[in-house]
């Protein structure tokens, strides 16, 4: 049995960590800092433009050495190298995993099954660049001869979460006068609200679906098509729709000129695809040069991950810290706390990246996993979160490791309330303060010295000892955003290697899709006919639904 498919919990490295946890579990972050005056300077990493402080973690230098030993026992370096070589490490689908090829420079070479994938990638990027230039310059015109003013991306999952997050993060780099919107949910209110104030004659849709058969995407695309053709006629489809897909036959049947179809490959998973043609809407907004900088940022961290020893390898160290808390301290969630409103959708993006990748209960060989996997990722931008859920982080009973993300230079800055100072300084002072309070808290003795009323000391005591990592960068640029995304991509991969998981499939998503397709006719028929194998709960809910839809009243019947 290969290392990545074996039971990591049976290794001596895992057992050493268990014993170490038992020996040191009472040790606090406050005590770790008191014992090591250089800790705050030395437990840091630099990867590209990212400065990463992980000193406020419940780990000693010996803990870190044991975690690196675990990574080597799991074969992290071997699996990493196999991925970069283009080996078929996605074994359940018999595919290579080559999102890293999307950001290789044009002069690089990577051959898979005798084929140069870098040349393929740059051919598509060049076509995207030509198209985005035509749109941005006004050369591309709609059916009435007017230039396009709004691009609407229709996709779901990785075809929405990635480009939507990136567009919001980099919207200050948008310089074409073209706004971008996103439709993903099959709830019709999403499409209706998005199109409410748009003009069909100046709107272009990007329909992103690899197979051009995704139910939610094609349902929304069909309604967008009706919206366009009812105003402009059938001939308008070719001027107001383009596709990100590999199914030329279905794209053509929809009415899209296949010259305006931009492909990507089976070796790119949806949640890793924002650097491919799936990012076309982003390129239209920020231009091909800024998009190239975005890809260069990914590549910077790809090289760091590929070339740096595990002891100083930022994605590997952060992944190992995640395993430490999930599997040795029982932490179930991870808070993502960007102190940047522009990164407002970054936690949701990471939810898919982490939870779809490692939310598995069997290893890549199909055998059951003997430990916890797949932490729940969640979060909100600071300082909003401080007035929502930080109370639980500071004084609750749950262990919640957190990642703070901040920038030295703001996209925009304004003076403080008194007309002086800097709003950005206020924002960042909150980041630094929150990470400090989470780590060190406030003791009863400190409160007593501050003359706190005795009956309030217990209420105001902050236990501290909540671990956090702080990731800082000079400024949120296209390159830095690419670096941040790649940092988390490779973290997720390393965690998956340690668990023996196949991190690049998502079979759990498929069954719900299949059953929805089977149930939809029962909802549409309205005649009370239900599949004979339905459970009583689902049958009762569908009957209630029929009653309300037909008569405006709820009628709950027995199956």
Swiss-Prot record:
Entry annotated with the keyword Nucleotide-binding: no
The record's listing under PROSITE patterns reads: P_GLUCOSE_ISOMERASE_1 (PS00765), P_GLUCOSE_ISOMERASE_2 (PS00174), P_GLUCOSE_ISOMERASE_3 (PS51463)
CC per GO annotation: cytosol
* Swiss-Prot/TrEMBL keywords: Cytoplasm, Gluconeogenesis, Glycolysis, Isomerase, Plasmid
The subcellular localization recorded is: Cytoplasm
Organism superkingdom: Bacteria
Catalytic site residues? 356, 387, 513
Asked if the keyword Thylakoid belongs to this entry, the reply reads no
What are this entry's molecular-function GO terms?
carbohydrate derivative binding; glucose-6-phosphate isomerase activity; monosaccharide binding
Q: Which reaction does it catalyse?
A: alpha-D-glucose 6-phosphate = beta-D-fructose 6-phosphate
InterPro entries for this protein: G6P_Isomerase (IPR001672), G6P_Isomerase_C (IPR023096), Phosphoglucose_isomerase_CS (IPR018189), SIS_dom_sf (IPR046348), SIS_PGI_1 (IPR035476), SIS_PGI_2 (IPR035482)
The pathway it acts in is: Carbohydrate biosynthesis; gluconeogenesis; Carbohydrate degradation; glycolysis; D-glyceraldehyde 3-phosphate and glycerone phosphate from D-glucose: step 2/4
In the record, biological process GO terms are: gluconeogenesis; glucose 6-phosphate metabolic process; glycolytic process
The record's annotation in CDD domains points to: SIS_PGI_1 (cd05015), SIS_PGI_2 (cd05016)
Class of this enzyme = isomerase
Q: What is its EC number?
A: 5.3.1.9
- Which Pfam families does the annotation name? PGI
Question: PANTHER family annotated for this entry?
Answer: GLUCOSE-6-PHOSPHATE ISOMERASE
Its biological function? Catalyzes the reversible isomerization of glucose-6-phosphate to fructose-6-phosphate.
- State the similarity comment: Belongs to the GPI family.
Q: What is this protein called?
A: Glucose-6-phosphate isomerase 4
**Organism source for this protein?**
Rhodococcus jostii (strain RHA1)
> What lineage does UniProt assign to this protein's organism?
Bacteria, Bacillati, Actinomycetota, Actinomycetes, Mycobacteriales
């Amino acid at each position: 049995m290969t290392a990545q498919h074996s039971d990591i919990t049976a290794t001596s490295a895992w057992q050493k960590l268990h014993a170490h946890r038992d020996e040191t579990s009472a040790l606090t972050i406050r005590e770790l800092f008191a014992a090591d005056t250089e800790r705050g300077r030395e437990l840091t990493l630099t990867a590209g433009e990212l400065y990463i402080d992980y000193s406020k973690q419940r780990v000693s230098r010996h803990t870190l050495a044991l975690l690196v030993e675990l990574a080597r026992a799991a074969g992290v370096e071997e699996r990493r190298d196999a991925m970069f070589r283009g080996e078929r490490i996605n074994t359940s689908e018999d595919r290579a995993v080559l999102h890293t090829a999307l950001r290789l420079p044009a002069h690089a070479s990577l051959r898979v099954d005798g084929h140069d994938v870098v040349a393929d990638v740059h051919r598509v990027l060049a076509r995207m660049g030509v198209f985005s230039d035509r749109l941005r310059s006004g050369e591309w015109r709609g059916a009435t001869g007017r230039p396009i003013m709004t691009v609407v991306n229709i996709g779901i999952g990785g075809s929405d979460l990635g480009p939507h997050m990136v567009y919001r993060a980099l919207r200050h780099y948008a310089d074409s006068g073209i706004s971008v919107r996103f439709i993903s949910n099959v709830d019709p209110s999403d499409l209706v609200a998005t199109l409410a104030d748009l003009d069909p004659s100046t709107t272009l849709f990007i329909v992103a679906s690899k197979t051009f058969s995704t139910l939610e995407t094609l349902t929304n695309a069909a309604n967008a098509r009706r919206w366009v053709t009812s105003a402009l006629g059938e001939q308008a489809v070719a001027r107001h729709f383009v596709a990100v897909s590999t199914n030329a036959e279905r794209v053509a049947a929809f009415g899209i000129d296949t010259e305006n179809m931009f492909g990507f490959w089976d070796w790119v998973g949806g949640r890793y695809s924002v650097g491919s043609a799936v990012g076309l809407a982003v390129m239209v907004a920020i231009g091909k040069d800024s998009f190239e900088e975005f890809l260069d940022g990914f590549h910077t961290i790809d090289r760091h991950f590929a070339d740096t020893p595990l002891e100083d390898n930022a994605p590997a160290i952060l992944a190992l810290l995640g395993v430490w808390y999930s599997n040795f301290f029982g932490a179930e969630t991870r808070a993502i706390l960007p102190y940047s409103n522009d990164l407002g959708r970054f936690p949701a993006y990471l939810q898919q990246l982490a939870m779809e990748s490692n939310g598995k209960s069997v290893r890549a060989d199909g055998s059951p996993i003997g430990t916890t996997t797949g932490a729940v990722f969640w979060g909100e931008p600071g300082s909003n979160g401080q007035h929502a859920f930080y109370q639980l982080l500071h004084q609750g009973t749950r262990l919640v490791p957190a990642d703070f993300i901040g920038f030295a230079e703001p996209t925009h800055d304004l003076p403080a309330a008194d007309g002086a100072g800097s709003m950005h300084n206020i924002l960042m002072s909150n980041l630094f303060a929150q990470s400090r309070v989470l780590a060190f808290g406030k003791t009863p003795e400190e409160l007593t010295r501050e003359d706190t009323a005795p009956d309030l000391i217990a209420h105001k005591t902050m236990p501290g000892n909540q671990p956090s990592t702080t990731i800082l960068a000079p400024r949120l640029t296209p390159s830095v955003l690419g670096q941040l995304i790649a940092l988390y991509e490779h973290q997720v991969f390393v965690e998956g290697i340690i668990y023996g998981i196949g991190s690049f499939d998502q079979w759990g998503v498929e069954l719900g899709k299949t059953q929805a397709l089977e149930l939809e006719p029962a909802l549409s028929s309205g005649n009370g006919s239900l599949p004979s194998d339905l459970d009583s709960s689902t049958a009762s809910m569908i009957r209630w639904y029929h009653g309300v839809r037909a008569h405006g009243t709820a009628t709950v019947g027995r199956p």
